[in-house]
Structure formats: C-alpha cells, structure tokens
Amino acid sequence: MLAFRRAVEARELERVGELLTEDVVLHSPIAYRPYRGREMVAGIINLVTTILEDFTYQCEIGAESDNDHALVFGARIGDLSIEGCDFVHTDAEGLIDELTVMLRPLRAVHAFEERMRAKFAAAVAATSTKIEAST
C-alpha cells in the first residue's frame, strides 16, 4: 500500500508532508494553476482534511513498485456525497513529486470549492498576520 495512503487514512498530516518532494506540484480540481512546494501542498492537504467528512480510500490502482498510482476515494461534504481520485507520481526515492486530484459530482465540487476558498483565504490571512507581526 502506498505510504501516502497509509498516512492520509491515519490522519498523520505531518507524515504526509514528509512524503512530498520539496518542489512537489499539486493540480487542484478548483484552481487553474498548479500549487507548488512542500509547505503549500501539505497545507492544502491539511485544509482538505477539515472539509471532507468520512473520507475513505476505496481502491488503489498501481503496484507498490510503480511510480504512478491512482487512489479512488469517497467522502461527504455536509449531506452531499463526493467521489474523487488522487493521481500520485513518485520520484526515484519514493517521494511524491506530482499529485493531481479529480472530483465529482459537480454539485459536491461546488460545495467543496466554496468551503475550500473560505478556509484558504483565512489561512493566507493568518500567515500574513504572522509575517507582519514578526517584522
């Protein structure tokens, strides 16, 4: 089983960050441009775990020795069911250097986007406040 899957299922978010390369790229289902860098991507994954309820991986496609994996998952957002797939690429050391996330159905994606944008804006504002306070 992919170490990323084990860490996400166990909600070991610090471990998730350790499994990312420094220059990891995240292709989000709600943003046109990809997010880059371990700190940014780990932070986004952390936010996602606060939005998706009853998150479970249902299927993993790809052999342990492969560099490409697909992790099919299900979750809830309030009373809406959401399904998705994490397409994970690992480098030669087994660290994740690219992650692409797909979600469906559209109504649940809109609910996810609404909640994610609010949490992301709050996180950016909190980070900006910390930076200003330290200068």
Regions found by a protein language model. Give the residues of each.
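C-terminal and inter-domain tail/linker signature
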Residues: 1-135
